[in-house]
């Protein structure tokens, strides 16, 4: 496992390259995108690596197979949920081999590795299922109706709402759920702002009361 890059770290080193291979894809052109971070990691560690988001890394660890990547978490790396493919501009790059094989959310990936099951005394029949982003999970767990929306305070502040069709606008991402779409946008500000108003001890106590 190599060095990770924080979610809120801007990576401007490959700005010109990114703009040339992501024409019209504003969500990929920000210095905070997964693509910007991926290219920075490739510059540092070379192309004989695999690029995985946190959830894909953990799932792969349980399977002892890091082949796969879940569709929602890989949008900011360039995965097109509508066309279900990576951008054509990626095809001739030397780093395409670093990308995961994308699988839809909710699909069974396989059973837990036998050695890990024995090590942690887990049922060897446990199946690993591809997940989704944290804010999508919060939206689904809330059980909201089609006319309702949700604000999620996490690393970022995210606003989500169900829509019949994907919304292709700057700053908006759309995630497929069955025949509908969870559409929303996120800021680069999040729960870190709480540290300006509460001490670590107060945050710990307030969190305990949730």
What are these regions (language model features)?
Residues 104-112:
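Glycine-rich phosphate-binding loops at beta-strand->alpha-helix junctions
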Residues 2-12, 74-78:
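A charged helix-plus-loop insertion that forms the helical arch/lid used to bind
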Residues 96:
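Internal glycine-rich flexible loops
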Residues 53, 103-104:
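Short acidic/polar alpha-helix capping motifs at helix-coil junctions
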Residues 13-67, 76-93, 114-210:
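Active-site core segments that coordinate phosphate-bearing ligands/cofactors
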């Amino acid at each position: 496992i190599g060095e990770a890059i924080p979610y809120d770290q801007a990576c401007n080193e490959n700005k010109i390259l990114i703009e040339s291979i992501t024409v019209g894809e504003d969500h990929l052109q920000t210095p905070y995108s997964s693509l910007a971070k991926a290219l920075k990691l490739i510059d540092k560690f070379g192309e004989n690596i695999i690029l995985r988001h946190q959830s894909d890394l953990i799932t792969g660890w349980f399977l002892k197979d890091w082949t796969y990547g879940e569709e929602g978490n890989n949008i900011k790396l360039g995965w097109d949920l509508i066309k279900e493919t990576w951008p054509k501009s990626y095809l001739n790059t030397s780093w395409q081999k670093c990308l995961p094989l994308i699988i839809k959310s909710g699909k069974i990936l396989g059973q837990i590795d036998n050695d890990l099951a024995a090590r942690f005394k887990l049922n060897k029949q446990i199946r690993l299922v591809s997940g989704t982003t944290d804010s999508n999970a919060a939206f689904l767990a809330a059980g909201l109706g089609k006319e309702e929306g949700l604000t999620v305070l996490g690393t970022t502040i995210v606003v989500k709402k169900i829509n019949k069709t994907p919304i292709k606008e700057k700053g908006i991402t759309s995630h497929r759920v069955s025949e509908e779409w969870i559409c929303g946008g996120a800021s680069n500000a999040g729960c870190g702002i709480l540290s300006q108003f509460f001490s670590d001890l107060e945050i710990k106590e307030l969190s305990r009361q949730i």
